[in-house]
Amino acid sequence: MSMLGNIKTYAQTVTSLSDNDDTSIDRLNYVVTTSILIAFSLLLFAKNYVGEPMQCWTPNQFAGGWESFAESYCFIENTYFVPMQDSNLPAAETREGREMIYYQWVPFLLVIQALFFCVPRAFWIIYPSYSGLTIADMITAARQNGKQLEGADEALEQVAMINWRTEQQKGHGSRIFNCYLVMKLLILLNIVLQFFLLNSFLNTAYTFWGWGIFWDMVNGRHWQESGHFPRVSFCDINVRELGNIHHWSLQCVLMVNMFNEKIFIFLWFWFAFLLVATAGDFVIWVWRRFDSNSKLGFILDLLNQEGIDHSPQKASELYKNVLRDDGVLFLRLLDSNSGRLNSEELMKKIYNISVGHATDLNTPIEEHATSE
């Protein structure tokens, strides 16, 4: 399969990763952002390796295939920028310091960035499975069975109780919630890493690169002066002909840099938006993890149904004896992805289990199902 085919397959796989066991902010990172990066990568792959990313002005001596050879050579071996106001080319020993070494590698960088955005998601998928909990499967079961009349009670009881008591017996009531926070922290750290990666890759003098380039454009300081993503550059090429070596300095048009500039400016501001949104989301979930009033308040909201004891004492009892932090996380994710009706229905099942089998809470759910 071709490289483009592999990238397309990868993009399709990434966009199907979501199992509704996270939040919309999480999906903005590993689904939306990854899809954007893959789309830009495909665009630049097509421009660089199918179209004509560079065209060079060549002397009359370059007949036949020499022009194509020169353009391919210059694209591979880098070019260097000379401001338009400089009438002479720089000295040969200083040209290497002016070289642009990024434009050939931009599509590959975008793929690497997309992979980085998938790492936190992979951690969230893999790690909880080792403890016997699969949040995605439980939420899917609750959503599907919540729409059915036959067998809904049994399925929801299974979803409500499976592994929560096992975790309590091991003394771990917060393992999955902690794992979820680690995943969010990894997302946040990845976004910060993206800024350093862009600055290093593009070799820019600006700390806040995207804002600096944008401000230059607003103030009329374009690439001819700043040297950022220049459309015109120079390339030195040596040609051996009849035993002699001829040195040529060619002027080339880097059409692909017009795309690179717009893509990277967009990505910088997109990453800035993600940083703010993800940081805010992380703070909210840390508060939900460690603030007792937040946990009990959420449980009370779900208990506020007819025929159910929705006293603070009952909410505290359900939290300590049945749900713990992992159970609250599951209910919050179900509430976020499936709506309040499903989460209230599931809480009602949990309440009925705790009331009807209050002396049997330590019995595994399989034994409880058998005794029925």
From Swiss-Prot:
GO terms for molecular function: gap junction channel activity; gap junction hemi-channel activity. This is Innexin-16. One of its GO terms (cellular component) is gap junction. GO terms for biological process: calcium-mediated signaling; monoatomic ion transmembrane transport; regulation of defecation rhythm; regulation of neuromuscular synaptic transmission. The chain crosses the membrane at residues 31-51, 106-126, 181-201, 263-283. Glycans are attached at residue 352. Pfam families: Innexin. Structural component of the gap junctions. Required for signals downstream of defecation clock. Keywords: Cell junction, Cell membrane, Gap junction, Glycoprotein, Ion channel, Ion transport, Membrane, Transmembrane, Transmembrane helix, Transport. Belongs to the pannexin family. It is found in: Cell membrane; Cell junction, Gap junction. PANTHER family: INNEXIN, INNEXIN-16. It is a multi-pass membrane protein.
